[in-house]
Structures are given as C-alpha cells and as structure tokens.
C-alpha cells in the first residue's frame, strides 16, 4: 500500500526527508531518521491503533511505560529524528518504536493498560531549557520560566534585596538554607550560586557546604584577580563551577589580568559580550580561551534597532546607579557598545559563544531565553545564509542543533548537571517540552516536569472541551501538591550532600550533587566549541576574528514576536 506524503504527515506526522518550518522564522529542519515503522505506527483515538489486543499489550506496569509520546519529532544537539519516546518513573527510558510486541515487530517501548499516551504527531519535542543566570528576585519567575519551556534554573538571590537585584548571589549559610526551603515546592529544578567575592577561602567553603552548587564572582562585590583566584581554588577543591561577572571599570586590572588569574582553569564567563558587565570594551576576547565557557544573556539577543536604547535605563536601574552622577552615567555608557553586540550575533553563529541565559529581572527576561535564541538563529540565517555544515542538505539542521545546545546541554555540562538534565537522552529526568511547529520557540503546548505534565496551554476550564478560548498557560497537576517535590530536584555540591543537608533542612525534594565540573573545557561544549583569536579595537570597539571584521546590521523586525502576542 502506498500513501502520499501529505496524507501520511496528517495522520502520523512528517517522516524522513520531510521539512518543517520553525515558527515564523526562516529556519527549516529535515527529519534525519524515523524510528517508527511504516504501517505499524501507534496512534491513540477512536478506531485507532492503541487498543487492547492491537497496539496495547496485556503486560503489567512493571513491563510497560508510564507514558509514551507517539510519533514525535525530537530536536536535540545530537539529532533531528522522529520516534516514540517512553517515560517511566519520571525518566526517559526509551527512544524508538512503541507498541505491542505480541502483535507488532521490533517493539522496544511497550504500551499496556498502565500507560498514558501523549500524541506527538506533528509536534516537536525538546529538552527543558536550563537557565544558568537567574536572579532570584521573585518566586513568580518560576511560572514565567516554566511556561516558556524552562525546567531548570541556576542562579542566586534572596528576593528583591538590593544585592540580589544586581548580583546573582545567595550569600551565607542562613540565606542558603532558607532559600532551599523556599524552593522545595516550586515545580522547577533549582541550583544556587554563593557569593564568591572573597580573598580567603573560609567564607566560600561554608557556603559550598551549606548547599550552593557554584560560586559567583561579581564586580559589584569585587572581581579582582585575588577574588577570582580564591574562588577557583575553592571550586577546584569541591568540584563546582565559578561564574564570573568581570570588572567593567578595569579597576583592579584589565582583561589580560583576569585571564591570567584563571591560570588555565575552567570558568563560566557570564554575558561575555560585555553589555551585562565585564572588562570594557574587550571582555569578549574571553570567547577565544580554551578554558573559558562563555555565555550570553538575552537582552542583547539578537542585535536590533532597539537594543542599545533599551540597555541604558536597564543598566542604571539594575546596578543602583544615579543618573545625576556623571561617573555613573559614564560607567553605563562604557558597557553598551553596538560593535560588540553585533559581533556577538556572529560569534554565536560560529559556535564561539556556547550558551544563552536570561539575567532575569536584572537586565534580562526569564521567559524569553528560548525565543531570543531562535530569533538570533533566524537573524543569522537571513544575514549569513546556510552554514557550511548545512550546504549539502539545504536546510538548517546543523544550525538548529547548534542553537538548541546553547540553552540545554551546554549549560547543563557547564554546571555539572548533564547527568540529570539538558537533553532528550535515555536515563535523564523527563523534563520535556512539546511544541506545535508553528508555535516553536515561543509558545509550548505541554511542559513535562519529571515525567508529569506541570504546565500547558489550556482553554476555558468551564468549557465542554479543553480547547476553547481563552487559552492561558496554567499550572497542571504536576505542579501541585506532593507531586512537585517528587518530580523536581535541587542541585548542590557533593560536600553539601555529605553533611546530611536534606534531613537537616527538612526538605522533601531530592538533592542531586553536581559533578565532573572542573575537568570541563571549551572543547566539551556541544557544537559550540570554536576558540578563535579575537581582538577589539580600544578606540572604535570593532571586533575582529583572525583579523576579519565581525559586524552585521540590526534587524527592525523579528519573528516569534508581535505575530504571537497581543502586547
């Protein structure tokens, strides 16, 4: 029997060779592999396949999946494929062909009476996003994050305190303990950054043992070579990461001095373009270092006609600056440079900047990590055409895989949590996001947290069916009651785990230790490991890679924007 591609896609979703447009961007993907079998696809519904004795087996719960996502398109750093995905005990346990082995061939994901089905036909599945630059200013950020497709937040803060508004630190054992208790019932994975700005180790070590998973060195608290070196010494002892907001004013040294303070050790460089902070005007050269894991924050993503104007007021507010003090205004002006922001776009497209994060409520928007990433990819597709790796296929598969790695696997690797989150891979937590292609990157359909639906675009709860307007993002059952603590984790150091912190603080959520952090290098950043020789002209701020000028024009119109939002 033969069937047209259109008819097949309508029933079972696209297959190998079919192309899909992502939202209203100029990005197109092509299915690389199909794990399902033609003629044996499992579909739920009246008169469909997943019924007793057909696609549903007689096996009990110990042998079948808790949930199967059928015929879904997976986009991840490792590939763009179509498959059935099996979830059990809150984890991804299989990617392949679902069904009933008694009636169908080559089934490796068994459906039974104990299995729930999520129809993935004509939908895209991605890993939940990992945001590694979150200012914990208000708990309501969690809903904004979750409903945009984020499932892990790593950052610091204690609420709208002046220090937290400016810097991503949760300082000291008392605050760390209280914040760990506060997030215990929030439906998202959380990790805390301690205050790393100290020139002796004791005050940092007590924070590591109290529960932080990384240290943050910030210029507002001091980012001197001494504080950087001390934080890295402590990190080396406890196998944790150091995140750096470097010295914008060049008070204690220049970018060369900061790079020397690293002593070739692994470090996460925040907003490495510099508008968010860091040596003016040339912190961006850190992207070329093999030990530096560089990230961007989303307010400069991508470069548009409004980017520069928006930043000045944001900067004054976030860093407690006074517009009546000339030195404060000069400080703000020194950080906002069209030339480095334009170069940042291209460095992302080259794979020289490895991650994108938010800088939530402190110059960035937590609900826009995902959409700003794809807007950047779209801009580069328009301005730079197909990447060399995509020329043969003629679609944007490699570029899409490069960009999705920036907010999933690479931040997870950087902070030592990729054994739990960051990709659609067997054994990891089932923190997954479903998207309809026309809403990809901007409005997810369903957000799963630890295998349970925690958020969704849901219609009127009083309607006869679930789809009528008004459709809002709402918390689902996975975000309520004891299910929350059973499907989320708090990331800590192994040293904190060894103190019995869980029992001491009375936590219900599982604690998970970060690991394999200090051995990471730029070469470990998936599809984003380019280490170019970068120079910045101190007078004109022009950025060059291997002598070639990096520049591009700002866009006046973006996808994934007004078309999808009333406001």
From Swiss-Prot:
Residues modified as N6-carboxylysine: 216
Cofactor binding: number and manner: Binds 2 nickel ions per subunit.
Main location per the UniProt record: cytoplasm
Pathway the protein contributes to: Nitrogen metabolism; urea degradation; CO(2) and NH(3) from urea (urease route): step 1/1
Record GO cellular component, one term: cytoplasm
Cofactor field: Ni cation
Amino-acid positions noted as binding substrate in the UniProt annotation, renumbered to this chain: 218
Post-translational modification note: Carboxylation allows a single lysine to coordinate two nickel ions.
Boundaries of every Urease domain copy: 128-567
Record-given protein name: Urease subunit alpha 1
